[in-house]
Amino acid sequence: LILANDPDADRLGVMVRNAENNWQWLSGNQIGVLILDFVLSALKLQHRLPQKGVIISTVVTSPLVSKMARGNGLNAVEVLTGFKWIRQAALRIEKEQGGKFVFGMEESHGFLMGNHSGDKDGIWASMAFAEMAAALKQNKLTPIDRLNQIYQQYGVHLDALETQTFKGTKGIAKIQQIMRDLRNSPPVSVAGQAVVKITDYLENTIICGNETRQGPG
């Protein structure tokens, strides 16, 4: 097991041995899903899973996170990219709605449980992942084994990151044009798969077929 933090220790990277005994890099989504699974299992075992518990993730994070939250009777909330939005949502939900923030994550390797920190915490995440791996080892399982079990329960979720850079004022104009085009002519299919729902976080709308309703707010 290899655990690594970035210089300010707010993110966590992980490599584990796979079935072929080769090192396998885990994505931020995979790390977060494993930590979330461990947190939920521990809270349930201790009978401490809050009735109004909330799991918060960003819009670019795997939908598996929300599925796991709802599968354990918790609310799932998605916010814009950036951990500050996770923290703001957690504070608002606890203050205004009487909810309890349980766990937050973003696919860019940022994770947090509870209110001990105002930002993502790579040190806590490292400790949580190490404890999770040790518990799995006692049951003769690896993090990869547990990840596959989660996939069997909630469905396989795969993701890959592609970066495109648009520099300067021309780049900004290009980005704005892309967004306008998407809104004016939303795709009906992507890679041969039908688009069933479009969420517009600027206009705060959700489009399902011919129906348009208010978005997540």
Task: Locate each region found by the language model.
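Phosphate-binding and adjacent anionic-ligand microenvironments
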Residues: 1, 21-24, 42-43, 47-217
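Short Gly/Thr/Asp-enriched flexible loops that form oxyanion-binding sites at enzyme active sites
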Residues: 10-30
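N-terminal small/polar loop signature for handling phosphorylated ligands or for N-terminal nucleophile
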Residues: 1-13
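Catalytic or ion-translocation cores adjacent to nucleophile or general acid/base/metal-coordination motifs
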Residues: 27-40
